[in-house]
Amino acid sequence: LLAWGLTLGLAVGIVSAQDKLFSELVGPGSVGAVKAGGALQVPFIIWGGDMATFYANGGLKTKSGSIFQKQGLNLNLTPGDDFIQQVRDYRSGKSPFLRGTYRMMGQASEVIGSDPRTKGVMIMQMTWSAGDHMVAREDVKTVTDLKGKTVAVQQGGPHIGMLDDVLKTAQLDWSDITVKYFSELTGDGSPVEAFRAEGSTISACFAVTPDMFGLCTDLNG
């Protein structure tokens, strides 16, 4: 995963495939400067690699004697799985950082690339590790079976690009499926919970590894 601002054109097809442009999801807002002094707001995400971040910081706020404190850092770690809100916070100056995948940054480029004050620079790639899955019902034997089906995914999240890759692999277009977007990555209001719901018409959903295990355990009885 990445901490940075702008990538150029990595997800033009993905952005146009959503029901709304990413800029419409983010909405209007003014560009603000990051306040000098005090703790820097850094978003964290549901990702195993962030264990190192929490360990080095000593928790959500930089703890005295922690690795980051000894390096002169003062950080406030805040939830960042709502990437649309992350971009709003970045634009307004609440945080100088964006956290996400390459494809998520491609979506954000529409917003942050529109003003020279918010154009970002990639400063770190944290991990290459996997942890994302598409879980499907029994009638979806191959990815080509997704045609005509309903697929659930978090809007603006890390799985938009993965869904795009799956469709390309199956030689399908976004118009070949019905996409249901959800605000949360996991828990209430997420694709996983919608997929799990009794009587759900969703044929496939995207999930992080713990949710995938939960779904597959349920499906196998």
Description of each model-found segment:
Residues 2-11:
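Bacterial N-terminal signal peptides
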Residues 12-17:
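Sec/Tat signal peptide C-region and signal peptidase I cleavage site
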Residues 18-216, 220-221:
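Short, glycine-/small- and polar/acidic-enriched structural segments
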Residues 1-2, 56:
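Composition- and surface-driven signal marking solvent-exposed, interaction-prone regions
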